[in-house]
Amino acid sequence: MAKTQSPLQWLATTIIRGYQLLISPMLGPRCRFNPTCSHYAIEAIRLHGFVKGCWFAAKRILRCHPLHPGGEDPVPNKKHRCDK
């Protein structure tokens, strides 16, 4: 069963998809990570919710610069309160 998105999650993922479809092709490949920062952001928002997902995405975007080596960086799994 698919998880229902909140309106903020829908808005954020729609804006990111717009960037992927309209702006990113003009800029060319720039991201140092796999998955790309925009795909990471969408996955983080879907998995962790709007606030925490945007926080993960912002931290990731701040790491995406020429001085960082990049590489594999998947979205962290969602931790439950009972997990330690």
Swiss-Prot record:
Pfam families reported in the protein's UniProt record: YidD
SMART domains named among the record's database cross-references: Haemolytic (SM01234)
Record has Membrane as a keyword: yes
GO cellular component terms listed in the entry, alphabetical order: plasma membrane
Domain of life: Bacteria
Topology within the bilayer: Peripheral membrane protein
Signal peptide start and end residues: none
Localisation: Cell inner membrane
Annotated keywords: Cell inner membrane, Cell membrane, Membrane
Coiled-coil region list: none
Stored NCBIfam families: membrane protein insertion efficiency factor YidD (TIGR00278)
UniProt cross-references to HAMAP family, sorted A to Z: UPF0161_YidD
Task of the protein: Could be involved in insertion of integral membrane proteins into the membrane.
Family: Belongs to the UPF0161 family.
Protein's name according to its UniProt entry: Putative membrane protein insertion efficiency factor
